[in-house]
UniProtKB/Swiss-Prot annotation:
Family annotation (Gene3D superfamilies): DnaJ domain, Heat shock protein DnaJ, cysteine-rich domain, Urease metallochaperone UreE, N-terminal domain
Gene it is expressed from: dnaJ
Predominant place of localization: cytoplasm
UniProt-recorded name of the protein: Chaperone protein DnaJ
Entry GO MF terms: ATP binding; heat shock protein binding; unfolded protein binding; zinc ion binding
Keyword Plastid belongs to the record: no
Length: 382
């Protein structure tokens, strides 16, 4: 089956920026993560989303994809040493698919033998953090389900006191040979042994604990240190804490994916924090000194007289620590001047007096040109 377009998978245009691609990935990865979404196809969709993001978030890979699509000439054919130009031959019909013809002639040679050492599978774990935990980091213990080597048989899969033997079907080679008539003549066909699955081993008496697999499912506690400054959708790799390797291969890795809960007051953009604070009309007009909450405690902020709504103030170094240790972000404070909606008669009278005494001062400064244009428009001078 042809692979879907990566841009279509993430739901972004081909001109999408890195930030747009990142936001789309975060949203979809949370929606389809197997730990959250129990739909039968969620794991496959999550894998598809992750693959698309890995390509489109890398400038070099994205450039190659934009030029060649899935038929990237840098890709190899069949996972082995044969250079196939990166083309998908799966749709070739007539002899059961182009890959089948190659396998018929050459057997399963290009593919990695099942009996060789292989790295264990990686494990993914979704962790929810509060806004503050993500900013400052924390140490915690998590419990993950994973497959581990069976203690009863020490991973051999055989009942204690017995041992695996050479597979009687393939005589320990892991492959079976047969002849086949094709339009090109009779050829020798080598395939993975269906009895031992390519391992070359046969287990006469299986281990009662693991049923012959050599592995059992367990839940393992792992102590992890979350660095300060992690953001929503980011991953932390814990090397060697995935599933055990196969046939002496190294263990896989653990990937912790972070979901950061939104904050009721702060918003985050990278290492910077944004917040809005209300000002009364009097505070904005006369100036004031107010207290602003930050992640590091309350700080005093001086509001100059004549401050307009939407004015932004920066509190240097009051943002989030950079997760890679490159300094600290800032906090941006945006003021909103609140217009009173319920006034007493006395307050209304004072405001009218204020307006009378103010004269045309409202039309001075940067807003004066705007009001002058409005005045001319009403007079037909514009």
């Amino acid at each position: 089956m042809a692979k879907r377009d990566y841009y279509e998978i993430l739901g972004v245009s081909k001109n999408a920026t890195k930030d747009e691609i990142k936001k789309a990935y975060r949203k979809l990865s949370k929606q389809y993560h197997p730990d959250v979404n129990k739909a039968p196809d969620a794991a496959e969709k999550f894998k598809e989303i992750k693959e698309a993001y890995e390509v489109l978030s890398d400038d070099e890979k994205r450039a190659r994809y934009d030029r060649f699509g899935h038929a990237d000439p840098n890709e190899t054919f069949g996972g082995g040493g044969f250079q196939g130009g990166g083309f998908d031959f799966g749709g070739f019909s007539g002899f059961g698919g182009f890959e089948d013809i190659f396998e018929t002639f050459f057997g399963a040679g290009p593919r990695r033998r099942a009996s060789g050492p292989r790295k264990g599978a990686d494990v993914e774990y979704m962790m929810t953090l509060t806004f503050e935990e993500a900013a400052f980091g924390k140490e915690t213990e998590i419990e993950i389900p994973r497959e581990e080597t069976c203690d009863t048989c020490q991973g051999s899969g055989a009942k204690p006191g017995t041992s695996p033997t050479s597979c009687p079907h393939c005589h320990g080679s892991g492959q079976v040979t047969s002849e086949q008539a094709t339009p090109f003549g009779r050829i020798v066909n080598r395939r993975t042994c269906p009895v031992c699955g390519g391992t070359g081993r046969y287990i006469p008496e299986k281990c009662p604990t693991c049923g012959g697999t050599g592995r059992v499912k367990r839940r393992k506690k792992i102590h992890v240190k979350i660095p300060a400054g992690v953001d929503d959708g980011q991953q932390l790799r814990v090397a060697g804490q995935g599933e055990p390797g196969v046939n002496g291969g190294p263990p896989g890795d653990l990937y912790i994916i972070f979901r950061v809960e939104p904050h009721e007051f702060f918003k985050r953009d990278g290492d910077d924090i944004y917040c809005e604070v209300p000002l009364s009309f009097a505070q904005a007009a006369l100036g004031d000194e107010i207290e602003v909450p930050t992640l590091h405690g309350h700080v005093k902020l001086k509001i100059p007289a004549g401050t307009q709504t939407g004015t932004r103030f920066r509190l240097k170094g009051k943002g989030v620590p950079n997760v890679r240790g490159y300094g600290q972000g800032d906090q941006h404070v945006i003021v909103r001047v609140v217009t009173p909606t319920k006034l007493t008669e006395k307050q209304k009278q004072l405001l009218r007096e204020f307006e009378r005494l103010g004269g045309d001062t409202m039309h001075d400064g940067p807003h004066g040109r705007f009001f002058e244009k409005v005045k001319k428009a009403f007079k037909g001078e514009a």
